[in-house]
């Protein structure tokens, strides 16, 4: 049997229409070429073409997941997958596990081997379908799986051994849960007979990760592997996406079995709690509220990442301005005239002004987190609130809405658009005066920065990158000031272009996430905008981008400090430095550590730029150089991310001036 660690939490019961998963029927990834395996010496007899693999991926709807306890038909089986094993041929549990991944459409994994997962790695070498991108640390592997999932919409897969290998996944799993990222993590475990004996490298990873996964499994019967893998992918991407962990004891991996691929999923409780289609009467009520309002604002978050087209159509029909959360960037084009860019602690003045002045707040795919709302009682205090979210636990958790719908945002927007289109000509929606009021705020309080001599303002570096890439690159970041500047100054055009650790704020995320994006979307320009503090936390992944020849570009904004903490020290602790200087105290004139030497050690081309006049050419060279590249951009540590609403503050407390050169 497979011992499920916990039933999927009701708080993660979601609708299935936009991101569900069932065996071999997954979201299309039309631009991803089949991975090359240069080191395979004895490929198995089956060779599937990329077209065959990707043609099996399709988007789920309610109708094709509603009957999860029925057997898969013979027609479905014939269409979805052809095994390299004969139907009655026994094979190891590890081979069953790898084939189960293949049947789910997996073509890339991020796996680091160890004693308890060796069997899985041996099975991976027998696969002609799955490429393993070897990270240099398990945290790099789980963050890469996240980057892959965030960039493609397809669940990322990471694999680690037991004990320290498994515990090294913890930050990535917590990050994926908070940011609703679909990943499947597989861990090796000590043999069943040794569980609970404090065996070498034994860690109860199911217990450790119970509160930071959407669901997890300890597989105690080899025959359960096909069902468990199928359920894991289904859970990871249905409803509100999230991480699922599968813990597989080593003796289960070694056991011979003839798998039953027709096992039904066993998720009756989860299925019964999924949201229904949006209530049409409630949608009509929302349209009525819009027609009655004078100052409506859209507040959109990561929950809108799958419904960008519907969102754009809704804005086109209503003329309502759009403010995005950090996780919502790209769902609506930042450069659009109706975009207010990002709201919240480091959001634009005009976005926060709009929310503060609004009489109707349309909150779509958001959770009213503290970095957006600040002081809850003061947030949108004049507005009626409409909250639509796929997670029922988020509705009313932080802010009580006037109207709420627990539904897939895509379906809700389709319903709203249909109603609006049917009333076109009858509804007289005119918010031009409101938009003009916001334009005044845009002109009065634009995003801006100062220059000092020939030093490179970090904001300017991102502006230049945006210009040279035409706003079309996939951007990953670490966490800190550089992250906020990347959110403010790069103009995101579409979803899955912006990869950042939002809820957890995990430093070290940027480079591994860029690796995942480069693997999943190899035809795109991928740039990791990083800080020296974040970058060095997973600097070992330079070896990965070199060995895998991944064209990841790293633009390092190097200020020799933990910049965001320094900013808070400047503002609230009288600039008292408490272990935030990352350079060499005995020689502050040198750049320490020398990031170029890290790159050189891994064979990655690198350069340093210190003068503003040299920056554009340096960034262009980075973009033009084939393969990976590191550009070390030296920036002043006195810069502050502005605007800033202090933690727990309200819009009236916004800070728009000053930096570390001043006293407070």
Swiss-Prot record:
Disulfide bonds: 158-304
Binding site for thiamine diphosphate: 138
Superkingdom as given in the UniProt entry: Eukaryota
Intracellular or extracellular location(s): Plastid, Chloroplast
Pathway this chain belongs to: Amino-acid biosynthesis; L-isoleucine biosynthesis; L-isoleucine from 2-oxobutanoate: step 1/4; Amino-acid biosynthesis; L-valine biosynthesis; L-valine from pyruvate: step 1/4
Binding site for Mg(2+): 532, 559
Cofactor(s) it depends on: Mg(2+); thiamine diphosphate
Keyword Zinc: no
Binding site for FAD: 240, 346-367, 389-408
UniProt xrefs under CDD domains: TPP_AHAS (cd02015), TPP_PYR_POX_like (cd07035)
Chain positions covered by the region annotation Disordered: 1-51
Top EC group: transferase
Segments for region (Thiamine pyrophosphate binding): 481-561
A molecular function GO annotation: magnesium ion binding
Similarity-based family: Belongs to the TPP enzyme family.
Protein name, UniProt field: Acetolactate synthase 2, chloroplastic
Source organism of this protein record: Nicotiana tabacum
Gene: ALS SURB
């Amino acid at each position: 049997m497979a011992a499920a660690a916990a039933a999927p939490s009701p708080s993660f019961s979601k609708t299935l229409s936009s991101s569900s998963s069932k065996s071999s029927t997954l979201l299309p990834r039309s631009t991803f070429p089949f991975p090359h395996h240069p080191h395979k010496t004895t490929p198995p007899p089956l060779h599937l073409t990329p077209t065959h693999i990707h043609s099996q991926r399709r988007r789920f709807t309610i109708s094709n997941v509603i009957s999860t306890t029925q057997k898969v038909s013979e027609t479905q089986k014939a269409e979805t997958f052809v095994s390299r094993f004969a139907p009655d041929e026994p094979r190891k549990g590890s081979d069953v596990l790898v084939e189960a991944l293949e049947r789910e459409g997996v073509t890339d994994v991020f796996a680091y081997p160890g004693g308890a997962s060796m069997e899985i790695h041996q099975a991976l070498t027998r696969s002609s379908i799955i490429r393993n991108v070897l990270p240099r640390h398990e945290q790099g592997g789980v963050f890469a799986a996240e980057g892959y999932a965030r960039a493609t919409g397809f669940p990322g897969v990471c694999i680690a051994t037991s004990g320290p290998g498994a515990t090294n996944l913890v930050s990535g799993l917590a990050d994926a849960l908070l940011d609703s990222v679909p990943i499947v993590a597989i861990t090796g475990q000590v043999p069943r007979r040794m569980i609970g004996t404090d065996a070498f490298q034994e860690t109860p990873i199911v217990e450790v990760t119970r509160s930071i996964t959407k669901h997890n499994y300890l597989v105690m019967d080899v025959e359960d592997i096909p069902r468990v893998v199928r359920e894991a992918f289904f859970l990871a991407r249905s409803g509100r996406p999230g991480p699922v962990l599968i813990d597989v004891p080593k003796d289960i991996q070694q056991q011979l079995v003839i798998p039953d691929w027709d096992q039904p999923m066993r998720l009756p409780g989860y299925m019964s709690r999924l949201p229904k289609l949006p209530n049409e009467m409630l949608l009509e009520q929302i349209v009525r509220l819009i027609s009655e309002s004078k100052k409506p604002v859209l507040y959109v978050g990561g929950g809108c990442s799958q419904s960008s087209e519907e969102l754009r159509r809704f804005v086109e029909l209503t003329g309502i301005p759009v403010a995005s959360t950090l996780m919502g960037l790209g769902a609506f084009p930042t450069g659009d005239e109706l975009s207010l860019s990002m709201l919240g602690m480091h959001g634009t003045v005009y976005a926060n002004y709009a929310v503060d002045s609004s009489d109707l707040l349309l909150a779509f795919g958001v959770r009213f987190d503290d970095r957006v709302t600040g002081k809850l009682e003061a947030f949108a205090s004049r507005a009626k609130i409409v909250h639509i979210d796929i997670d029922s636990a988020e509705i009313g958790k932080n802010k009580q809405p006037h109207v709420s719908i627990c539904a897939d945002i895509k379906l809700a927007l389709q319903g709203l658009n249909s109603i609006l289109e049917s009333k076109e000509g009858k509804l007289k929606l005119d918010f031009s005066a409101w938009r003009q009021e916001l334009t005044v705020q845009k002109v009065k309080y634009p995003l801006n920065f100062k220059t000092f001599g020939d030093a490179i303002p970090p904001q300017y570096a991102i502006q230049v990158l945006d210009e040279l890439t035409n706003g079309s690159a996939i951007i990953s970041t670490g966490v800190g000031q550089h992250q906020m500047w990347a959110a403010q100054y790069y103009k995101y055009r579409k979803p899955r272009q912006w990869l950042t650790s939002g809820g957890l704020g995990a430093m070290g995320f940027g480079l591994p996430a860029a690796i995942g994006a480069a693997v999943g979307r190899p035809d795109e320009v991928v740039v990791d905008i990083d800080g020296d503090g974040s970058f060095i936390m997973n600097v070992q992944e330079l070896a990965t981008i070199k060995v895998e020849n991944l064209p990841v570009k790293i633009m390092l904004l190097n200020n020799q400090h933990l910049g965001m903490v320094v900013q808070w020290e400047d503002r609230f602790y009288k600039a008292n430095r408490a272990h935030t200087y990352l350079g060499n105290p005995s020689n502050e004139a040198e750049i320490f550590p020398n990031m170029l030497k890290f790159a050189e050690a891994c064979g990655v081309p690198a350069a340093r730029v210190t003068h503003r006049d040299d920056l554009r050419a340096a960034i262009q060279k980075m973009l033009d150089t084939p393969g990976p590249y590191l550009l070390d951009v030296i920036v002043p540590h006195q810069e502050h991310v502005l605007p800033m609403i202090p933690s727990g503050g309200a819009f009236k407390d916004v800070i728009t001036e000053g930096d570390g050169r001043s006293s407070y």
